[in-house]
Every structure is written in C-alpha cells, then in structure tokens.
C-alpha cells in the first residue's frame, strides 16, 4: 500500500499553505520593523520572541494533542496563528509585535509537532522515511513559494495581512476531509527528555541541532535585514531568500545519500566547513548568489544529518523523546542566534551576522574533528 494515503496528502496540502504564510511573514516582519526605523536589536528581539514561542509550543504540544487529538489541535493552532497574524495590523509597536510573534511561534511549533506525529502514526517502519522526506520537501517548497510571492504581490503591511490570514484559514480545510487517530493500541509510560540530552553517544548530534538552530534562526530572522541595509528592495530580498531555501531543497537528497554511504561524521564535517566557506565568501564581497547557494546547501541540510546521528543509538521506544530533545535543542539555538547576533550587529556592523555564523560553525567543526566515541557502524537507520 502506498505511503501517501488520502489523509496524508490532504495533511501535506494544508502544511504547504500554512508554510507559505510562515515564509511570507518571517521575511516581511523584520523589513516592516526596519521601515518603521526600529533599531536592529529590537528587530532581533521580535525574531527571538517567535523562536521563544516555538520552544513553548514544543513543550506543550504533547499534552495539547493528547487532549484534543490531531485534527482539533491542528485547527486550533491554525486559528491561533491567524489571530496572531491579524494582530499585527493593530499597531506597529515593538511590545505588541513581541507578543503577537510569540503567539505565532507557539502556533507554528504546534503545527510542526502535530504534522510530524500524525505522519509517524500513519506510517509503518518501512515507509516513515518516505513520509518525513515528503514533509521536509513540502515545508521547503512552501518556504520558496512564499519568498517568490514577495516579488509578485504588494509587500505593504495592510495589503499582505488579509491574504495571509485567508491562506491560513484555507489551510484548515483539507483536514475537514481527513481524520487522524491519536489513540495508540497500547499506552506506554513516557520517556523523559532530559536523559536524552545527557546521552554521551548523542552529544555531537545534539550540538549539531543547536548549531543548526543558531544558523537558520539568524538567517531567517536577520538576513532580510542585512540585505535591506545593502539597498535591496523587498522583492530582491525575497528572491535571495528563495535562492537560499531552494539550495536547501537541492542539497537534501545528495547530502542524505552521502551520509548513508560515507557516514554521518564525514558529512557533518563537510557541511560545517562549507558553511564557513560560504560565510567568508559573503564577508569578502564575492558573488552573493553563489555564496548564498552553497551556504543554503550546507546549512539547511545540517539539522537532518545531526538528528540522524543523535538517533543512531536510540531504541524505538526512545525515538519520540529523542526527537523532542533534538527539536528543543534546535529551538534553543534559533532563539539564542538572532538575539546575540542582532545585538552585535547593532553595536558594531551588519557583517557580524556572517562572522557569528562562521564562528559557531568553526567551534562545532573543532568538536567534530576530535575523535568521537567508537560506533559500531557509521550509518544510521532513518
């Protein structure tokens, strides 16, 4: 039987529409704040409030799904995101936007956990990899479409918010025609997340997820601001962001194949080294588009390879707790990255964005170059 059943396809359709909305706002929110002459550190704090919401949403998602089920929790999360989006029209104020983006971050994290969990519950041991691969491709595709739309439609606040809100409401419709059961055949006691974070064999993978969060959080939150300060229009910024994310889509398959064939450790070393090269190329004012392309190829594929490394020695019963620990690690990184980087950019120079990215990547590369604990196999079953 095909892994892509009717409910799965409907769920992925809803995710695509929702992700387009996320991508549009993640790019335009920093630009709107910049146009209002807010200082860089405040723009970074608004980005960080979104990632703080991601962290809170990750922590409450399990109980939320348990209480409401997949379908109702999905619809409630969409409504929360739509309300947080419409709230941006009330006033362009630092404190109010801090709150609205926090709520939007909670809604996004809930949607991610709901969709991932529903896909895992729908799949089997033989097709879960296909389902999660489709999930990542849909997510990145929605991100690219959202960036490309910025070159077609008006980017004014009062023009964007109504159709983005309508798109989120439309994303609720597919799950009206699909039902996902959240009851398991036999309940087992939940496994704590904290022991997963302390597991020695998973340390490099967990650190990789943190670094990935710092990298992607900074790029999503501050690269639009960096490009805007370079004199680019909103449409040009959207095009550069689309290039960045598209390179991540292109890099997914070859990086996964390399990791399967040559081992996670070697691929992680290559990815981190390429991130450093891309950052240095941008700082050296070399061709921006090729530099962003190689940065996206390496940076956007770092998280799944690090996640596979961390899950390598986790038993089947521990996978949910380990995945939760990894998502928390990523979220903490994506929270810390824009906060620290925006303060440095405000104090010194916009170039600190790529200096910070190259710096944290170099630290992780030093960890990877140390001899790791012996592994029975360099490959991980995904």
Swiss-Prot record:
Cross-referenced Gene3D superfamilies, in alphabetical order?
Answer: MFS general substrate transporter like domains
Cited Pfam families: MFS_1
List locations, semicolon-separated.
Answer: Cell inner membrane
Q: Name the domain of life.
A: Bacteria
According to the UniProt entry, its GO molecular function terms are: transmembrane transporter activity
Transmembrane ranges, per UniProt, are 8-28, 41-61, 73-93, 94-114, 133-153, 157-177, 208-228, 274-294, 325-345, 349-369
- Topology with regard to the membrane? Multi-pass membrane protein
What keywords does the record list, in alphabetical order?
Answer: Cell inner membrane, Cell membrane, Membrane, Transmembrane, Transmembrane helix, Transport
Q: Which NCBIfam families match?
A: PRK03633.1
HAMAP family tied to this protein:
MFS_YcaD (MF_01149)
Q: Which family does it belong to?
A: Belongs to the major facilitator superfamily. YcaD (TC 2.A.1.26) family.
**Name this protein carries in UniProt:** Uncharacterized MFS-type transporter YPK_2680
